[in-house]
């Protein structure tokens, strides 16, 4: 008897499946043409940019009817946003984390300003 092969999360996760859809690919490219730049840094969008959902509600994940709920981010900006805000399962104290990063940058300024 063959063992039962379980489907991986990538094969069953509705978010992953939606991001593989033609509808998402078309929407993503349309948003890239409109926004052109990383929302955080202002840098031109890289090939592997992320179209970030501002609404983390899983029930609304595939609702692309309101373009204002999405921003284009390059990968580093996307990682930083999720580091500060959370990952959809957990929410962090982003204001505290952002304050700590600001303090760190100010310290670096002190050590590096001539």
Task: Tell me the role of every PLM-derived stretch.
Residues 34, 80-81:
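Conserved SAM-binding loop
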Residues 34-37, 70, 101:
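Secretory pathway export signals and precursors
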Residues 40-72, 81, 85, 91-92:
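Histidine-centered nuclease catalytic patch
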Residues 1-26, 30, 42-45, 89-114:
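A boundary/linker detector
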Residues 23-35, 63-67:
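Short, flexible, mixed-charge glycine/proline-rich loop motifs
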